[in-house]
Amino acid sequence: MIRIIKNAIPFLCGVAFFISCNSKSEFLTPVCFDGKYPDESAQDIEIVVSDSGEVNFKIFAPVMNKYEGANSYMDFPEGIIVTSYSNGEKHSVLTADYAISEDRIQRMEASKNVVITDLQKKESIRTEQIIWDKRNKIIYSNVEVVQIKADGTTNRGDGFEADERFTKYSIRNPRGEMLANEF
C-alpha cells in the first residue's frame, strides 16, 4: 500500500502540472496598463511648496492620480485649488475643474472653469485654460479671458501673461467697459 502511494504522488503531481499548464490562458491575463490607470491615487490631498521655510504655494485637490514612466505626470480629475502666498499672506487663489502637472517639462495646465483671484486687488480672471510654466515662473493663457475688477467693470482679452504669484499681469488685446469718474 505504501509503495502504491509513493508511486501515485509523483504521478498525480505530474498530471496536475500538465493540466494546469495548457496553451490557453483563460484565467491568466498579463497586468499591463499602458498608462491608462494611475500608479498611485490619493484623495483629499494638500501639497505645500515652500522655500527656506516660507510657504509659496498650497495645492488642494479632492483626487490626485500619479502616472509613472518616461513622461510621468499627475492629474487632478475632480478639480484643484492653488493658493499662492507672499510674505506669509495669501496673495491669490486659482480654482479649476481639471488640472494636469507634467514633471519632465515642469508645466501645469488647468482647464474648465478656471478662476484666478488676486486677493489684494480683489480682481479676478476667468478663462477655460491656463498654463503654469514652472521653469520660467509664468502663468499664461492663449484663450479668451474675462477680467473682473474690484469696481465691477469687466474687460475681455485674447489671453494673458502673469508672474507665477499673479502679482503682475497683462491681458492681450483688451476690450471692455470702463467706469469714468463723475466730475
Model-identified regions with their sequence ranges:
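Mature-chain termini and adjacent capping regions
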Residues: 1-183
